Amino acid sequence: MSRSKEVSPNLSQQKRGDVRSAGISGFSSPIYRGRLNHSASAELQEGYRILTGGQKANIISDKDLFKAIHSCGLHTSEEEVNDLLRVVHQDERTLGLEFPEFMMLMTKGIDEASIAEMRRPFSVLDKAKTGVITKKQFTELFVSSGEHSSAEELEELMLLAETSEELEVVDYNKLINELAILLNKM
């Protein structure tokens, strides 16, 4: 296994703000969750190696990425994986992930823009801007958005939001904050 500093020596020389803006070993940047130590970097390198089928490939194909996501129990369509790749590439390419892009995807934290985007569908239903919607609205929102969530998954989300049994409401601000915390800990 190669050392993390050897992955791409010119990454830190690239312009700031680019997906590859930070060096791999011990980098710290506003878009990342924090310093990435050698152990975490080695684990990510191993994960990348596994996803490339143990080959010394420079890219995880979109098909292998789709298979890996499905093997984790996430039911996404090929188009959703392609959308993810477009976001990561920041253009229309959907051909797969190179290691620096994989690192960005696996270590990027949730920022305020992402949190605002998560709030947007709820705010459409919450005309009074109270921060809560009914459990019925919550369930309908997920069904209408095309999410294939089970009743148990919706219940887990409602528990994260600390729903009130008496009031039959979901505090979506609490839910979004809890999800952001959980995602940033991953």
Swiss-Prot record:
Instruction: Outline the segment boundaries, as ranges, of region: Disordered.
Output: 1-23
Q: Where does Ca(2+) 1 bind?
A: E98
The keyword Protein biosynthesis is assigned to this record: no
Q: Under the cellular component aspect of Gene Ontology, which terms does the record hold?
A: myosin II complex
Alphabetized GO MF terms: calcium ion binding
State the UniProt keywords alphabetically. Calcium, Metal-binding, Repeat
**Which PROSITE patterns does its entry note?**
EF_HAND_2 (PS50222)
Report domain EF-hand positions: 41-76, 77-112, 113-148, 149-186
Quick one: which residues bind Ca(2+) 2? D126, T130
Highest taxon above the source species: Eukaryota
Additional record remark: This protein has four EF-hand homolog domains, two of which may be functional calcium-binding sites.
Report what the protein is called: EF-hand protein 5
Q: Which organism is it from?
A: Leishmania tarentolae (Sauroleishmania tarentolae)
